[in-house]
Amino acid sequence: MPFFRNGLRRSVGACSSACTSPSPIPASPKWTRRCIHFDGRSRLSNFWSPTQRKPKGDRSHQNGEIDGHELLLRAGLLRQSASGIFHLLPLGLRVQDKIERLIDKHMTSLGASKTSLSSLSSEDLWRQSGRLDGRDSEFFRLQDRKEARFLLSPTHEEEITKIVADAVHSYKDLPLRLYQITRKYRDEARPRQGLLRGREFVMKDLYTFDTTEPQARETYEAVRQAYVAFLTDLRLPYLVANADSGNMGGKLSHEYHFASDRGEDTIIGCDTCDYSVNEELFIAPLDKAPSPPVADDAPSMPTKAGFFFAVSKDRRKLLWATQPAQDVFDFNIQALKEIFPEIDTTFDGSDYKAVMDAWISGAEEDGEPRTRYLLVDARNEGMEGFFEQWRSVTSLPGPEGNEVPVSSEILPSEIDGKPVLLTKARDSDPCPSCEQGKLKLQQATEIGHTFHLGTRYSQPMQLQVLDANNKQVSVSMGCHGIGVSRLIGAIATLLADKEGLGWPMAIAPFEAVLIPTPSIDKADVESLYDQIHNAAIDTTIDDRERAMGWKLNDADLVGYPFVVVMGRAWADKKALELQCRRLDIKEEVQAADVVSRIAELSQKL
């Protein structure tokens, strides 16, 4: 039998000093840390929560920042299996279950039915939708013994569209709203930040189906309101931003974020109006331009100007973009992509040689002429001489020393005929939506996304219904996600402090933990537990045979919203110590008042 770090051997069975119910399980010595109880009360001696001490070289407070992922590991909510792959332990599963129940509540409010789709998806369906090509590296792919090819689904638009297409044929069967909470898979090149960027994750996906575009947009707005209600129930500050639909398709989408210094997204908001957008979607009009520094006088180009070099995906076009001040502004890749859609973003825009080599060397391979474009931010000054020099170039030396014919053109920095800036937003830039506001940039962690898809999937997947006029129409769809496991990691980081984790009441593994000293009569402990539990407060008793200091530190590490201590005050006057770390409260309350006090304080959490 193995020995553990305290020098004691593991015992199997019930603790004879704490268990009164008859049991076929053999009794254990008094020093055991685990008991098996049968009285229906929640006890940590029954519950496996393998918390850990701070390891040497602990990184949870690295650079003054709290690492929520390290605390999730130490608090016994999860364990890592491999890079980007994690196992949820009992405490973590309780958090996830509560998130899922909260999601169920708000999906039910939309009239959505819950499903559970297979993790295996046919490559044929992804090929039919057009999403298989160019994304090979993102998928976990496999082949069965009959050489049929599958992938582990990162999302289920194709599968759900096929299911509905096979079953729904009339507008009378719509609207339809289906959702699932399942595991998804993506072969991340660089998994990081624990649950925030993993290769296996739990997602809620809601798929909506409507007969017409206006109806689909009404559905979209209803879903947005349900998301707001869900996040409001968590009682945590959140951001909602207009977003890029990316590979999902469609033009209308919103992201839902928690502000976080460790977030991978940047949200641009206004301090006056409700303007809010992901930086990836931000393009500023010229009339809201911040003033650049004055450029140096130069015959050909300003010496302070910043340049960005890019080549088209077919290697036949070269882009030189310039903005007024390299040390002040950063290029906005989204603006460059809107003006020059062929851009290959895999190149480093500052690596002039690599871009030029890719562009000019292709001329010898295909023999086609090359075109180069100059894209100039409208705030650039003193560029006239450079313009003339640019236009005059009709050939350039090739890799083998031969001359390659080129045409040199100048692109206007315009989108839909309106002048725009080529640079990213900065704090205190003027708001493009209102006249008075200033922009504020915040790092954030995305925890949800709503997409209006339109007919992006219904057309290629042939999802059509007969409308009221007896005409075949493609169904208008929406897809709306919440990262369930991602929420756990995001909230852990958001609420953690130097003592440990913190949880909103709605999803805490337990809302309160009752910690009695060993001298407290067991009947008193159970009576107080029943009082709190019967008030619909999710409570557990820490009856493990550990020192009180260890138990209190363990409670802080796990992050229970309320800690109820039965100690010296109980013996003297039947009073308790009530602790709430998030509110910085540690106070004495009478046993009769503990439920009402917890209810009162919980409104502030």
Regions found by a protein language model. Name each.
Residues 2-605:
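NTP/phosphate- and nucleic-acid-binding module
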